[in-house]
Amino acid sequence: IGCNWSFAPIVDINRNWRNPIISTRTWSQDVEQTLELSLEYMRGIMESGIAPAAKHFPGDGIDERDQHLSFAPNWLSCEDWDATFGRVYGGLFEAGLPSIMAGHIALPEYVKYFNPEATTEELYMPATLSKYILTDLLRGEMKFNGLVVTDASHMVAMTSAMKRSEMLPTAIAAGCDLFLFFNDPEEDFN
């Protein structure tokens, strides 16, 4: 389609050294350093004609489970999230970040903020399937108007939430623009 796109930078914040995925892939455990290095990476690849997709919104590095194999939420309060992951993503949005990759990470405190009557299922729905996280928080509160792609759709944190036939339309309704990986093209497109 005439563009190069990188699923990077990883802007997760390493707040749990036992996290098997993020502890070796993040810039730092420091918010400001994560933002500074992510901004420089973003500027550099954009100058080279590559579109960045910061990941994994709303932020990994808190829990010690791996979304490839299990469900793993981000347990931060709204205030703590705003001061950490919200600060990093907000800074990238201000600098013109064109896309993000939504992670299969629940953000229950923000779901409660948007819907105090949320069910347990809604509280722990992965961001890729949550209207509260992608539409209300990302697009509404944070005013992000770029492209949203899901993380890999075969990861257990997503597949354990619902049947695949429900998952695709739910991801689109939640606010995802692109779905990463298909199972059976005929099944998925129907």
Per-range role (PLM):
Residues 26:
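Conserved beta-strand positions that form and line the central face of beta-propeller blades
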Residues 2-9, 175-179:
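Divalent metal-dependent hydrolysis catalytic cores, especially in the metallo-beta-lactamase
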Residues 29-190:
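Second-shell residues forming the walls of enzyme active-site clefts
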